[in-house]
Amino acid sequence: MNTIIPISPINNLKTRLSEFLTLEERKNLLFNMLRDIFKALKGLNIYAISKDPEILEFCNNLGAKTIEEKGKGLNQALNQAFSVVNEDLLIVPADIPLIRESHIKEIKKLKEEFEAIIAPSRGGGTNLLYLSRASLINLRYEGFSFLKHLEEFKRNKVSYYIYDSFYLSIDINTPEDLGEIFIHGDGSYTKRYLESLNIKVEPKHSSAGRFKIYRE
């Protein structure tokens, strides 16, 4: 199975975390999330696509083949990657550090029966997408891409499976998202890195959110 990981440049990285983490800290957060993701993807052919040479060098050192992104936007980046590899494809975002090898084993079984497998994010996005062939659908990332991709499956009569996983639904975009790593990320590079920054998490039962995230 071939895996494509599209990655934003460091300067545009996780801007919703910018009031909580410095740019250097966000870069190191990304690198530790990638370590967790690569660990889960062990044994697969991994392709990283980015405009950022530092990110590509890091991924190459982890064992990935790298593609220098030429276009603009996620859909264009992935279509560019499809010119390199276009069958037996698993698209994995760079911000789902709770992915596990067990998820990949299940996907390998499911792909024997279904042409496409999709895991939604909590916000209605697409956090994992398997396609037996790149030509099955038009990619429709951005916005509520989960629903858009379901429309594509139905329009093109593609057999698909919705992989509804809590762990795969967690993507890291805001300070509150970091709380999920403290609860569910034991043993991960990402959690160890956040702990090294003296970040603390407390429960918060209110409409304002689930966690109180702060630094000592």
Swiss-Prot record:
InterPro entries: CofC, Nucleotide-diphossugar_trans. One of its GO terms (biological process) is F420-0 metabolic process. Pfam families: CofC. Pathway: Cofactor biosynthesis; coenzyme F420 biosynthesis. One of its GO terms (molecular function) is phospholactate guanylyltransferase activity. The keyword Iron does not apply. SUPFAM superfamilies: Nucleotide-diphospho-sugar transferases (SSF53448). Its EC number is 2.7.7.68. It comes from the Archaea. Keywords: GTP-binding, Nucleotide-binding, Nucleotidyltransferase, Transferase. Disulfide bonds: none annotated. It catalyses: (2S)-2-phospholactate + GTP + H(+) = (2S)-lactyl-2-diphospho-5'-guanosine + diphosphate. Guanylyltransferase that catalyzes the activation of (2S)-2-phospholactate (2-PL) as (2S)-lactyl-2-diphospho-5'-guanosine, via the condensation of 2-PL with GTP. It is involved in the biosynthesis of coenzyme F420, a hydride carrier cofactor. Belongs to the CofC family. NCBIfam families: F420_cofC (TIGR03552). PANTHER family: 2-PHOSPHO-L-LACTATE GUANYLYLTRANSFERASE. This is 2-phospho-L-lactate guanylyltransferase. It comes from Methanocaldococcus infernus (strain DSM 11812 / JCM 15783 / ME). The lineage of its organism: Archaea, Methanobacteriati, Methanobacteriota, Methanomada group, Methanococci.
